[in-house]
């Protein structure tokens, strides 16, 4: 059996870039909660002892940006300079302006257009991907890297590993077999964890705790063997982390947010953007489309692309590729996808209920992936029943 190796990485919520994603989405949540028609393009950057939020926001909501920044940093665990940032003492800079009137008239006609006539907020192309290799219909390499990152945070916050600090990165290499276009995981080849820690813990303690409390509960035993390689804090020391260690910026972890390098990516980030921004809503609808194709048994693996022009409601193109795993031709699957999903931005917003903020709805997406999550707020993960005629054997 000929196999190959594929690697996906993740970072957890204390990584500086992910901190910025979460702040941007916390701002979006606050705006949408009070004013569902808010137009939000919120960026965040951070470095030692400083967080800045900036961008274009048009909203009727009353938003305390500084409080959102401090609350988000605190909830992640940035509560002192020792761990990389002090939520209560750091400088918070805010530079927010209104959405450009040129964009506003072209996209939503200054709020006068009907939902079906609302244009895309920008040009761009987005991809959705699904694969039958996991129950989530997501790539195993990505799922494991993401879940290990989430577990790191869990054992830090619940006190299991008191030496842990907020910043951390994970990476998983999986050995795969290509079954006529479908991906079949064989084993986990390598697990890499680099996590921030306090000064008191030894490297041996770190390795022992990570294996016992993080790796063992997450990676199914069937994928591990005596040849699996573990790189646990291979640099030897990771005390300085968070924004003190590295600068952070919204939108720099777009592969971690999506499919871990599988499928494809149009380049647009998600966090801090309201649903008229097709970078986000377009990527959500094509995930639902790809997932529905696989879940309905039409293919074992699917990639769906959609593209837009600014101010134009109808997509410019829709594309489907099932990597040779489709039970019917891709052109027939494409026809079913176009009949079953409304790719107009205003209609995607309604059908996926994307104007609903609050409850940390978009904040939840900003760490540990936007796809493959079992949470009713992730409306794009709901499989749509598709009508198709299965070919007779």
Swiss-Prot record:
K(+) binds at residue 43. Its cofactor is Mn(2+); Mg(2+); Co(2+); K(+). This is S-adenosylmethionine synthase 5. The gene is MSAMS5. Keywords: ATP-binding, Cobalt, Cytoplasm, Magnesium, Metal-binding, Nucleotide-binding, One-carbon metabolism, Potassium, Transferase. Signal peptide: none annotated. GO terms for molecular function: ATP binding; metal ion binding; methionine adenosyltransferase activity. Its EC number is 2.5.1.6. It is found in: Cytoplasm. Belongs to the AdoMet synthase family. One of its GO terms (cellular component) is extracellular exosome. It comes from Brassica juncea (Indian mustard). Pathway: Amino-acid biosynthesis; S-adenosyl-L-methionine biosynthesis; S-adenosyl-L-methionine from L-methionine: step 1/1. SUPFAM superfamilies: S-adenosylmethionine synthetase (SSF55973).
């Amino acid at each position: 059996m000929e196999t190959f190796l594929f690697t996906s990485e993740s970072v957890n919520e204390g990584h500086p870039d992910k901190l910025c994603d979460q702040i941007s989405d916390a701002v979006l949540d606050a705006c949408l909660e009070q004013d569902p028609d808010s137009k939000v393009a919120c960026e965040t950057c951070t470095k030692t002892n400083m967080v800045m939020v900036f961008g274009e926001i048009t909203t009727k909501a009353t938003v305390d940006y500084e409080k959102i920044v401090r609350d988000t940093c605190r909830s992640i665990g940035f509560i002192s300079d020792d761990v990389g940032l002090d939520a209560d003492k750091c400088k918070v800079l805010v530079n927010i302006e209104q959405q450009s009137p040129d964009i506003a008239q072209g996209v939503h006609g200054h709020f006068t257009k009907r939902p079906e006539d609302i244009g895309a907020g920008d040009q761009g192309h987005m991809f959705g991907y699904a694969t039958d290799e996991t129950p989530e219909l997501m790539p195993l390499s990505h799922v494991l890297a993401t879940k290990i990152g989430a577990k790191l945070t869990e054992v830090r916050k619940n006190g299991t590993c008191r030496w842990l600090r907020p910043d951390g990165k994970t990476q998983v290499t999986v050995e795969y077999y290509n079954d006529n276009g479908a991906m079949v995981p064989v084993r986990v080849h390598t697990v890499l964890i680099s996590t921030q820690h306090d000064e008191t813990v030894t490297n041996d303690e770190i390795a022992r705790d990570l294996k016992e409390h993080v790796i063992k509960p997450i990676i199914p035993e069937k994928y591990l063997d005596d040849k699996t390689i573990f790189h646990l804090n291979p640099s030897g020391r990771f005390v300085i982390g968070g924004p003190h260690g590295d600068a952070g910026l919204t939108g720099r972890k777009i592969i971690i947010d999506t499919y871990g390098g599988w499928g494809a990516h149009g380049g647009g980030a998600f966090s801090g953007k309201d649903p008229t921004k097709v970078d986000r809503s377009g990527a959500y609808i094509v995930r639902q489309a790809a997932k529905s194709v696989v879940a309905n048994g039409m293919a074992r693996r699917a990639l769906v692309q959609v593209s837009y022009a600014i101010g134009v409601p109808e997509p410019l193109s829709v594309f489907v590729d099932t990597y040779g795993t489709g039970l019917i031709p891709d052109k027939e699957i494409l026809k079913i996808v176009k009949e079953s999903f409304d790719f107009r931005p205003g209609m995607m917003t309604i059908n996926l209920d994307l104007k609903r903020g609050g409850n940390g709805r978009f904040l939840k997406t900003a760490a540990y992936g936007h796809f493959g999550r079992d949470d009713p707020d992730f409306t794009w993960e709901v499989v749509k029943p598709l009508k198709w005629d299965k070919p007779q054997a």
